Amino acid sequence: MTATPQSARFSVSLIFLIYGTLIGSYLPYLPFVKDRFGIGESAFSMGFLFGAGGALLSLPLAPWIIKQVGTRKAVLVMSLCYLSMVGFMMAAPSFPIFLAVFLLVGLTISTWEIAVNSQASAIEDQMGRPVISSIHGFWSLGTFIGSAAMAGWLALELNGIWLIWGLIVLSFLALPKVYDGLMRREQIPAESTKESAPLKLKYMLYPPLIAVAFYMIAGYMLEGTFQAGGA
C-alpha cells in the first residue's frame, strides 16, 4: 500500500510524539538513577558524554545506512533499538553498564534524526506547504506529556521506572502504525534515484550553512547542559 502525504505526516508526528514523551519521562527520573549508583553530579553529568559520543560516532555512517535501507526502514530499526536501549539503560545495575548502554542509545540517534527529518522534508515538498514545524511540535508536546506524567507518578510515590517501561511498551505497540504510514522509497525522489550527487566542498563552505551549523552546535550545547544539570 502506498502512503499518502497525510498518512506520512501522521506517522512522523506520532514518532516525534513517542520520542518526546519518553525523553520527557526519563529525564526527571535520572536523579533517582544517579542516587542508585551512589555517585555525584559531576561524575553522572560526564556520563552524558557517552550518549553524545555515540551520536557523533554514528553520524558518518548514517547516510550510508539510510542509502542501503531507506528512511522508512531506518526509522523503524532505529526506533526499535532506541526503545530497547532506553529500557535497559534505566534499569542498569551499575554505572559502567549505564554508560555502555547510553553509548548505544547515542548510536541510534543520528540515523534516526536524519531519516525521520528526511521523511518530514519529503512530506512538506509533496503537500506544498510548510508542515515541518508543526511535526516538530509533537516532540515538544511529548516532552510536556512525559514530564507531567512522571511528576504525577512520583507524586503518588510510585517507582518511576515502571512508568518508563509502560511507555516503552505502548511505543512498541504504536510502531507498526508508524511504519505503515511512512512514505516508501519510490515516493521520495532522493531515495528512488540510484545516482548519488557528488559532494562539493563549496557547498559545505556556503556561509549560511556554516551559520546554521554553529547555531545548531550552540543549541545542542545548551540542551546538553540543561539535561546534565537537571539530572
Language model regions located:
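Helix-breaking motifs and short loop linkers at transmembrane-helix boundaries and internal kinks
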Residues: G38, G70, A91-P96
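Extracytoplasmic gate region of multi-pass secondary transporters
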Residues: Y26-L27, K202-A231
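Cytoplasmic helix-loop-helix junction between adjacent transmembrane helices
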Residues: L103-G137
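Paired small-residue
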Residues: M85, P96-V105
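Helix-to-loop junctions at the C-terminal end of transmembrane segments
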Residues: S58-T71, L154
